[in-house]
Amino acid sequence: MSAKKPMALVILDGYGHRETQADNAITNANTPVLDGLMANQPNTLISASGMDVGLPDGQMGNSEVGHTNIGAGRVVYQDLTRITKAISDGEFQQNETLVNAIDKAVKAGKAVHIMGLMSPGGVHSHEDHIYAAVEMAAARGAEKIYLHCFLDGRDTPPRSAENSLKNFQELFAKLGKGRIASLVGRYYAMDRDNNWERVQKAYDLMTEAKAEFTFATAVEGLEAAYAREENDEFVQATEIKAEGEESAAIVDGDAVIFMNYRADRARQITRTFVPSFDGFTRNVFPAIDFVMLTQYAADIPLLCAFAPASLENTYGEWLSKEGKTQLRISETEKYAHVTFFFNGGIEDEFEGEERQLVASPKVATYDLQPEMSAPELTEKLVAAIKSGKYDAIVCNFPNCDMVGHTGVYDATVKAVESLDECIGKVVEAIKEVDGQLLITADHGNAEMMIDPETGGVHTAHTNLPVPLIYVGSKAIEFKEGGKLSDLAPTMLALTDTAIPAEMSGEVLFK
């Protein structure tokens, strides 16, 4: 069998691009190899943060998200951005599970109940999503829309719910129908440690309107809780019902939509609506259509609006199906990233996939050994390139990120310089076997060592772009405006391999 000419992807973890020279461990390092590549080889900048990698706008990238996007060949949206995007492009409003539950209740003259963490925190839920759900129910003809508000105070300031409640009161006034039906702190409604006596308070509040307190408006109920020295998180079960209004308890035939997207604190309260539940004795158990926004657990037999997105035909899986061989190689610190995360959350190797792990050095902090295990990793990588065994190789060098996180500037400069030497050897090996190489990063870090806002040490990732450099015999010209999810289709195109339909990323050369 003839020797294979590998397509290698080298990810310099934490190697971002920043024009400013000040406090930039990358531009201030002595890097003749990388400088030469930038001067003489096709190169461009690609995005590694925010919506381009499925994160909220402006949010810095991270290694897990970065490698998932690279391996998937498509933008992988986190639940928050996935739902936000679905709302903005109309997919949410057309969601079959939500539409059916609402329409069934409307047809029967029943209520649509919407429950969830009423918060702009964006950790477990987002109030913008709840707002959209209320508007959707109204648009589909629901007359009775009842909002059961779980109050935050953990991912938001301890007493910050008033603004959210006022916004919803205004929305209902504008719609001319629906109302806030109940308030309770997340301490009760979102317990995750089997404190069922807490969860029961929230369940009884929603199914029986059983409450310690009743007030005519949500803001009055909240003010009373504050007067009792209860912060948002700990607000006791409070029914919101003005004189003459009918009860907003959940009854047979109603639809209930739970708008939290994060599973861990949504599971317990959701399980109370499952027939087989035995955590406490339920006084009433209404026959309803209950919709989870996302899947909170595979064993909860309730409707789900947004099923987990499974990543079919990632780069690794596709190469395997095409009968190709591949190697994943890194140090301990980033080994999971080039394997588990790169494979879309799959632990096992695909057929034809091999893995090599180089132990990261045993030092207290990596500024003490900025080269980490790069020399040994390079030796193994060069041997793999020359072995003729692999069609594709994915390697991560952790230095810029791991040393960058220490905040020690001089050590981070040394880390960059040690990598430059390593890249020189990798390029040489690729040229020797007539292979191809892409050098990039999953996110930035080392290019900003001092926070320009505070003047303090900057140890976090950045939201800056990352370089992409091509080494190989093809005369290519890169397009502008790429992102991490474009790398897999680009590598497949460079090796004249078919690109699976699931990969919505673009080929980055003209």
UniProtKB/Swiss-Prot annotation:
SUPFAM superfamilies associated with the record: 2,3-Bisphosphoglycerate-independent phosphoglycerate mutase, substrate-binding domain, Alkaline phosphatase-like
Keyword line: Glycolysis, Isomerase, Manganese, Metal-binding
UniProt keyword Isomerase, yes or no: yes
Annotated Gene Ontology cellular component terms: cytosol
Binding site for substrate: H124, R154, D155, R186, R192, R262, A263, D264, R265, K334
Catalytic reaction(s) noted: (2R)-2-phosphoglycerate = (2R)-3-phosphoglycerate
Enzyme class: isomerase
A Pfam family matched in the record: iPGM_N
EC annotation from Swiss-Prot or TrEMBL: 5.4.2.12
Pathways involved: Carbohydrate degradation; glycolysis; pyruvate from D-glyceraldehyde 3-phosphate: step 3/5
Entry keyword annotation includes Lyase: no
Record-level Gene Ontology MF annotations: manganese ion binding; phosphoglycerate mutase activity
Record-listed Mn(2+) 2 binding positions: D13, S63, D442, H443
Binding site for Mn(2+) 1: D401, H405, H461
Cofactor binding notes: Binds 2 manganese ions per subunit.
A single GO BP: glycolytic process
Cofactor(s) needed for function: Mn(2+)
Active-site residues, as the UniProt record annotates them: S63
Biological role: Catalyzes the interconversion of 2-phosphoglycerate and 3-phosphoglycerate.
Family: Belongs to the BPG-independent phosphoglycerate mutase family.
Subunit structure: Monomer.
Protein name: 2,3-bisphosphoglycerate-independent phosphoglycerate mutase
